[in-house]
Swiss-Prot record:
CC terms in the record's Gene Ontology section: plasma membrane
Entry function: Catalyzes the transfer of an acyl group from acyl-phosphate (acyl-PO(4)) to glycerol-3-phosphate (G3P) to form lysophosphatidic acid (LPA). This enzyme utilizes acyl-phosphate as fatty acyl donor, but not acyl-CoA or acyl-ACP.
Pfam families: G3P_acyltransf
Cross-referenced SMART domains: G3P_acyltransf
Keyword Transcription applies: no
Species, as recorded: Thermosipho melanesiensis (strain DSM 12029 / CIP 104789 / BI429)
EC number, as in UniProt: 2.3.1.275
Localization per record: Cell inner membrane
Record-given protein name: Glycerol-3-phosphate acyltransferase
């Protein structure tokens, strides 16, 4: 029963497309706007800082709460729920099994299972996005650093964290190609939240 509950809770919460709903509050179909990705960065770029912040928060929180709700069952079930939350975000039943790239939701899982790894991710992400303004690059490097941190912390679940990270990175294949080609879009995330609203 714990397996079924963890799978259901994880997928259900992860599948709630908060970024889609939040963008709709401003009359935007995020699937048909900007990059078309159902995620916080696309909401930020096209709906502004307030809506972008909401999208980021809820995409993180839904994965966090899914893991938290099965905490009493033990670490194995937390990891199952977390994995299903990320899969739910990327393949949402509410969006015909389409969704985002899973970065914010993976971050939420990291925070819920091993908070230090979440802090490592956020620190690396913030530094790289501030320096390069490449959100995709910051996200991918942040995920890898967090996974490496968990490995050196001696946690058995580092393999799951690495798998989630690699899954999200694979969903960035178009971004990776654009980074290689030198035409990946830059986004001044910090500028958005401090009133600059700068987009490159």
């Amino acid at each position: 029963m714990e397996y079924i509950y963890s799978i259901f809770i994880g997928y259900f919460f992860g599948a709630i497309p908060f970024s889609f709903f939040i963008a709709k509050l401003k009359g935007i179909d995020i699937r048909k706007t900007g990059s078309g990705n159902v995620g916080g960065t696309n909401v930020l770029r096209n709906a502004g800082a307030f809506y972008g912040a909401l999208a980021f928060f809820f995409d993180i929180f839904k994965a966090y709460i899914a893991v938290f709700l099965v905490k009493g069952f033990g670490i194995k079930f937390m990891l199952i729920a977390g994995t299903m939350a990320v899969l739910g975000h990327c393949y949402s039943i509410f969006l015909k099994f389409k969704g985002g790239k899973g970065v914010a939701s993976t971050f939420g899982v990291f925070l819920a299972v091993y908070p230090w790894s979440g802090l490592v991710f956020f620190g690396v992400w913030l530094f790289i996005v501030a320096v390069t303004k490449y959100v995709s690059l910051a996200s991918m490097i942040g995920l890898i650093f967090a996974s490496i941190f968990v490995f050196f912390a001696g946690k058995d679940f580092w393999v799951i964290f690495l798998a989630l990270s690699l899954f999200s990175i694979l969903r960035h294949k178009d971004n990776i190609q654009r980074l290689i080609n030198g035409n990946e879009r830059k986004t001044d995330v910090i500028g958005y939240f401090f009133g600059k609203g700068k987009k490159n």
